[in-house]
Amino acid sequence: MGTGLRSQSLRGPRPSYGKLQEPWGRPTEGRLRRALSLRQGREKSRSSDGGPERLDTLGQEWLPGSLGDTEQLIQAEQEGSQRWLRQYQQKIRRRWESFVTSFPNVTLSRSASPQPPLGTTS
């Protein structure tokens, strides 16, 4: 009886599947697309086979439209990452500048930006 309940809970969709997000709270387009395609493949497999027992055919059913589609998805995800990084760096720069300006009697001989840690390039 316990195993029946366990297998039943594994078959049902979990509400957190649709909410894939990065730690900063913004959903990643590429991951959401992948989650949706995997979910559609799983539902397609389930409806045609009558259950999740035939998961071995799932990998064969899902094929990307073409290599160009895959490249477009990768490029879109990279552009999103670059956009986030640029926004993050701007936010850090603004915070640093506001921190430095909070000391009115201090003048800096260098530009008002933090030095990157050793071993990294900027």
UniProtKB/Swiss-Prot annotation:
Tree of life domain: Eukaryota
Annotated stretches, region: Disordered: 1-68
Comp. bias (Polar residues): 1-10
Annotated Basic and acidic residues bias: 40-56
UniProt cross-references to InterPro entries, sorted A to Z: DUF4633 (IPR027990)
Pfam families: DUF4633
PANTHER family per UniProt: HYPOTHETICAL PROTEIN LOC689065, RIKEN CDNA 2010003K11 GENE
Protein name: Uncharacterized protein C11orf86 homolog
